[in-house]
C-alpha cells in the first residue's frame, strides 16, 4: 500500500474501523495528519532522537562503522564509509496484529 492508498484507507467510510474518529477525516485532513507525523519522525531521527510509541514500535538510529567491502561486479576491494542507519522495531501490539 503506498501513501495515497493509505490515505484512502484512513478515510474509507465503508471500512470497518474500531474507532469512529477515523470516519470523520477528510482526505485532505488525513494527508495533513500523515505528513505531520512523518515529517516529525524524520526531524526527530535527524536530530538523533529515538522515538518510542508504546505498542506501535520504536524508531532509532544505528551507527554503522566504516568497513571494507567488495564490488560485487568486479570483486575489487572498496571502502564503505561510516553512516547512520534509521531502523524501526515493531511493538507488541503491532506484532500481535500481524499474527
Curated annotation (Swiss-Prot):
Histone-like DNA-binding protein which is capable of wrapping DNA to stabilize it, and thus to prevent its denaturation under extreme environmental conditions. One of its GO terms (biological process) is chromosome condensation. The lineage of its organism: Bacteria, Pseudomonadati, Pseudomonadota, Alphaproteobacteria, Rickettsiales. Pfam families: Bac_DNA_binding. This is DNA-binding protein HU. It comes from Rickettsia felis (strain ATCC VR-1525 / URRWXCal2). Keywords: DNA condensation, DNA-binding. Belongs to the bacterial histone-like protein family. Residues 67-86 are annotated as: Disordered. InterPro entries: Hist_DNA-bd, Histone-like_DNA-bd_CS, IHF-like_DNA-bd_dom_sf. GO terms for molecular function: DNA binding; structural constituent of chromatin. Homodimer.
